[in-house]
């Protein structure tokens, strides 16, 4: 049974919270927008079991990349697993509103991350973009569940909206991935 506790941290543009359990605290990664309306990655540390007690103020951990990069329009943390922070890299396009890449950053020390880049790119299985990966481990294999954009459909206002499939990829190291399966019934 879930109990709603209300707001523990106030940021008008905070979204997509990701919890990492630590020894004596919970680290909550989240996304907020900068003055250019780009997503940036942050975290706060809160007391384990009492998230209203914020132990450390918000700290920035990911910023958008340089022009032309796969995350030039923003970054959104989606999963923290071991020493890796998985995130969505955003770009803006002319033919469709945006394009995303499942990406990874490796933790170096003291919550400093080095962006490694995209881990799932367009290919024969995922002809569109990938995003929002959630990673776990089964035996010695990393399992990454993610969304795959397979189409853009005009809505009632003729704005293009993405259509998604849920897919699974596997990896031996959490960095190099192989797409293997779709959960939504379509085959791409």
Each language-model region and where it sits:
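Beta-rich carbohydrate-recognition and catalytic domains
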Residues: 1-73, 79-128, 136-188
């Amino acid at each position: 049974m879930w109990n709603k506790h209300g707001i523990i941290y106030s940021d008008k543009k905070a979204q997509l919270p990701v919890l990492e359990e630590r020894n004596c605290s919970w680290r909550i990664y989240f996304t907020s927008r900068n003055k250019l309306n780009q997503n940036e990655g942050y975290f706060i540390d809160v007391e384990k079991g009492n998230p209203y007690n914020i132990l450390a103020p918000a700290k920035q951990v990911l910023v958008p990349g340089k022009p032309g990069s796969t995350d030039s329009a923003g970054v959104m943390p989606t999963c923290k697993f071991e020493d890796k922070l998985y995130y969505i890299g955003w770009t803006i396009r002319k033919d469709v509103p945006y394009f995303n890449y499942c990406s990874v950053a490796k933790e170096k020390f003291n919550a400093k991350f080095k962006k490694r880049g995209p881990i799932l790119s367009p290919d024969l299985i995922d002809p569109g973009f990938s995003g929002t990966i959630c990673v776990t481990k089964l035996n010695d294999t990393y399992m990454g569940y993610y969304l795959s954009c397979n189409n853009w459909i005009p809505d009632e206002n003729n704005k293009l909206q993405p259509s998604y499939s849920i897919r699974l990829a596997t990896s031996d190291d959490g960095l190099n991935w192989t797409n293997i399966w779709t959960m939504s019934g379509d085959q791409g």
